[in-house]
Amino acid sequence: METEFSTEVKQVAAVFKEYRNSIDIYTEDKVEDKAFYVTLLQRLIKDTDIKINDIHPLGCKADVISACKTDDDRRRPCLYIVDGDIYLQYKTEEPVENLYRLDSYCIENYVICEESVCQTAYELNGGRFSMDEIKSRINYLGVLMNSLSLIDLFFWYSIQSELFGEFELRHINSYFNMRNAIVDNQIVSNRIEEIKEGLINHNYTKELLEESLIKREEKFEKSIDSLLKIVSGKDFLIPLFCNVINHRVCSISLPKEAWKYHFSKTCNLDRLGELKKAIISACLVYQQKNTEN
């Protein structure tokens, strides 16, 4: 049985790897996700002199934020990274020094693009199909356009979270038409009606629900950009394209960590520009403080 260490012990463990890193990066998730984070962050900062060879997963979001708030060790630059989650839609979080909140549902959202999906399919397929054939089979934009109803679903997840204090994030397989690996919009619509009915049964008025929905629709248009931002990349978008690859290119069984690791190797990094700035800024601020002292 694997020993589970406390957040404090995980933080202290970073000391033993300081020589390998210019900055200490703390994240959510588990040890199994290290390769994914390191690959992504190394690509992100490769044109700088910053070294990132390790990251330090601390567990859930609350643990990461708590660790950041209580971290008074200023010997080295550090950055704590947390997901935007469902709160991205309706809550303005207080700023915390050395804490970076992603502006999408989770870190996995950033590795989804046509290049990463199709390159992964090409490699896993062993090159049997040309890249042009892969792109035609996958039809990346078509898959996303057919999945825009997930934006509405996540609007209602967030309304449920804001008003009721919790929501049930069912896996995307619950919304699949498994015959052709696409989102079944009727199933999505039925689930939205269930959420509405549940809220009304808890005495939330239709007027309040409509007002809450309008606020979200005004903030996030119904577009692919919004889909890639507010719908969970980990539980929805990556599994969506895993199923598409399995149905349209080649059938292969991989753990979820392997899929996102493959995507992280070739994904477009433009949407991670602000995170790159935050990493560079954390290093510069530390250097400036050291110079002043």
Which sequence ranges carry the predicted segments?
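Acidic, divalent-metal-binding catalytic cores of TOPRIM
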Residues: 1-293
